[in-house]
């Protein structure tokens, strides 16, 4: 088990497994921060950031609280741009009940001067060792309560725009394990459709609900991908339905999805815009037969 971080961590300001992300752009922000007079952070909430009435401007330094839902720190890379990307997601759990506006992604990008032969993901993990925020993200545990300070940001994603918190120059304060663990929101898988066609346009539910924890009940699987072990679910076991991305499950060890037509009492996962929209279960326990 990872050790809980009980101290404030501050990035060194050095710079901001699996399939490559299918999106129109990666996080390339590399802001200049004056550490002598850092801007005061605006205290807000994840629900307020995701609200249609949100008026907070991109780049505003904000402070929010949430509970970690990521089973691990997600790492990707772009060797052409020379960046490593790190991500975790959190949800607001108070006040209850849970809503589809509870989730948000924490992102960090670190510049890498050169790549060597070998795994880019491994090199990005090594690069993270010199940045305190990147290491703090890696130390986070599911169910951990955290206070986050970073910059409100958005990202162009598969023809849509998603919200996130840029952790460049940010802070993470661990507050121990949450008293109120995340609760999934019951949702309809036929509403969470992966974008297809040309040009692809991200479904509004993924832009509006990214990072939310959802649960589909009494569904059947279809469309199994034998390479990546992803599959889709719907009430009837046929399209339309939601794509279940198994990235987290495969990253935690060997995973093979079950045959098409498998019935699940429930499938729980994180709403993510990666690959133009999918639901990522956190662990195998999120797939209940």
Where are these regions (language model features)?
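OB-fold nucleic-acid-binding modules
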Residues: 19-289
């Amino acid at each position: 088990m990872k050790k809980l971080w009980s101290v404030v961590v501050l990035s060194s300001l050095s710079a901001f497994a699996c399939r490559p992300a299918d999106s129109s752009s990666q996080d390339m922000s590399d802001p200049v921060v004056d550490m002598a007079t850092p801007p005061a952070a605006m205290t807000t909430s994840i629900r307020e950031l995701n609200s249609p009435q949100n008026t907070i401007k991109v780049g505003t330094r904000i402070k929010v609280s949430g509970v970690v839902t990521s089973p691990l720190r997600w790492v990707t890379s772009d060797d052409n741009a020379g960046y490593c990307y790190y991500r975790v997601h959190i949800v607001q759990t108070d006040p209850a009940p849970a809503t589809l506006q509870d989730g948000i992604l924490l992102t960090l990008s670190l510049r890498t001067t050169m790549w060597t032969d070998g795994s880019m993901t491994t090199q990005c993990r090594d690069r993270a060792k010199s940045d305190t925020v990147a290491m703090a993200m890696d130390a986070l545990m599911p169910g951990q309560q955290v206070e986050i300070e970073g910059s409100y940001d958005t990202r162009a994603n598969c023809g849509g725009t998603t919200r996130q918190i840029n952790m460049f120059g940010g802070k993470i304060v661990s507050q121990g394990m949450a008293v109120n663990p995340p609760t999934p929101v019951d949702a309809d898988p036929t509403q969470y459709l992966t974008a297809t066609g040309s040009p692809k346009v991200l479904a509004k539910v993924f832009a509006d609900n990214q990072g939310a924890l959802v649960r589909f009940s009494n569904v059947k699987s279809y469309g199994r991908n034998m390479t990546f072990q992803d599959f889709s679910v719907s009430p009837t076991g046929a399209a339309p339905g939601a794509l279940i991305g198994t990235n987290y499950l495969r990253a935690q060890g060997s995973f093979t999805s079950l045959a098409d037509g498998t019935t699940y009492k429930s499938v729980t996962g994180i709403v993510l815009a990666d690959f133009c929209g999918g639901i990522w279960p956190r662990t195998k326990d999120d797939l209940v037969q």
